[in-house]
Amino acid sequence: PILLIGNAGCGKTSYALELIKILQGKPGIKIDLGNSVANFTCTGSDPSYKDAKKGIIIESMFAGNDNKPIKNPIIHFDELDKIHQDEKYSIETIFYSILEKNTAKQFRDNFFGVDVDASGINYIFTANSLKTVPVPIVNRLKIFHIPDYTEEQFKTSVLDNFYQKWLKINNLKTECFPEVLSDEIKEKILEICKCDSRAVNDAITQVFARTIVYDDAKDSHIALFSAR
């Protein structure tokens, strides 16, 4: 299990999601620990309870397209530093067992009432800081520190990647927009986002909104520049 740690907006979560997609060929299971996640999210809940369901551990092992078991799926736990330790059903207690190979070999899903070998599951954690992460959990993880993006990195690669995703998300015709971002456009985007990856999409939208018009002939939005 690994932990990617770095300041907010450094790209660690995006990297984890892309890495999982590359390794598995599809998106993996992502759990946001900042949302007060209970331990039965992993272990499953008692079938006698209303809305009971299986846990994500066993779910991940049968998440293949053909429903055949997967020995080594990947689960992503985001915002480990926001884990709620003082709650009765804190997920923290589960980490002590699933992050140890020996105990993970006999992991029990409460919904099905069976033990499964979960020792092959891979875990990627992301966090902004180690300060609030329990030491026993830290000791079970291989830690990688992710540095902030430099302005040069933003200009040469980050903005281009975000721009291509922005076009796809907004279903915009690429022939009506710049194939690549010019230095002028990048400067305008950087003025708004301040090298914060979380603000890039909004910054791109703001810059292009100043220039976009609708072309009836092409039945599409087109981008005109300069963005000043």
Could you describe each region identified by the protein language model?
Residues 48-85:
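Conserved nucleotide-sensing/catalytic segment adjacent to the nucleotide-binding pocket
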Residues 38-43, 132-172:
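Conserved AAA+ ATPase core "coupling" helix
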Residues 77-116:
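Conserved catalytic/switch belt of AAA+ P-loop NTPases
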Residues 6, 44, 79:
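The Walker A (P-loop) glycine that initiates the GxxxxGKT/S ATP-binding motif of P-loop NTPases
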